[in-house]
A protein has these predicted regions:
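Short phosphate-engaging motifs
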Residues: 15, 33, 96, 122, ...
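Secondary-structure transition/capping residues
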Residues: 49, 82-83, 137, 166
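Non-catalytic, surface beta->alpha helical segment in thiol-disulfide oxidoreductase systems
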Residues: 54-80, 141-175
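Local sequence-structure signature of Cys/Sec-based thiol-disulfide redox active-site neighborhoods
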Residues: 1-25, 79-112
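Small/polar loops that bind or transfer phosphate-bearing groups
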Residues: 26, 64, 89, 114, ...
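Extended, hydrophobic interaction surfaces within ordered domains
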Residues: 1, 5-76
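Conserved small-residue-rich
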Residues: 84-142, 150
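Thioredoxin-like thiol-disulfide oxidoreductase module
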Residues: 26-47, 115-134, 140, 159, ...
Length: 175
């Protein structure tokens, strides 16, 4: 997750400031205008503290809400999360969805699946949380952390290292 830019939104009148290693800290008490960015993701002050991790071009990859101070630090510093449930929002035609499900299976992480081509409410929710993009796969962890088309290494980190790494095939030398 080190290639992602991390923004931690909090309200200093209700939460302590996150540690500096968490990245860009945005205090809504000091910068009320920042609430507009959260509103575009369907988030409000009730969802704070919130972690938003983006690509350098601004594409949102991870959103975490209602996190404890420890969870905020772990997620923001790339140490993954502990979750009890995972839901994969996918489409049947999507190769990235199949890859994400394979990583979850390798990690022995049980998950439910929702096809957003068949479930309009799920599609609307993905659009809302991703800032208006129809991103598949979208993964929801315990209804508090969302990952948008995470590459396998990022997904493994989110799973807190639970994914089993498959050994790479080695080329045998011809004798």
């Amino acid at each position: 997750m080190s290639h992602l830019d991390c923004h931690v939104y909090y309200d200093s009148t209700r939460q302590t400031a996150p540690p500096a290693e968490c990245g860009d800290r945005v205090d809504l008490a000091a910068d009320p205008g920042a609430a507009g960015h959260l509103a575009r993701l369907g988030l409000s002050a009730a969802d704070l503290p919130a972690v938003v991790m983006t690509e350098p071009d601004g594409k949102i990859r991870i959103v975490g809400v209602r996190l404890s101070a420890e969870e905020t630090t772990l997620l923001a510093t790339g140490h993954g999360i502990h979750s009890g449930s995972v839901v994969v929002y996918s489409s049947s035609w999507c190769p990235d969805c199949r890859r994400a499900k394979r990583v979850l299976e390798e990690a022995e992480a049980p998950f439910a699946e929702v096809d957003i081509d068949q479930d309009h409410a799920a599609e609307v929710m993905v659009l809302e949380r991703s800032g208006g993009r129809r991103v598949v796969p979208t993964l929801r962890f315990d209804d508090r952390v969302w990952a948008f088309n995470p590459a396998p290494p990022l997904l493994r980190r989110l799973l807190n290292g639970r994914a089993k790494v498959q050994p790479r095939p080695t080329k045998e030398k011809a004798e």
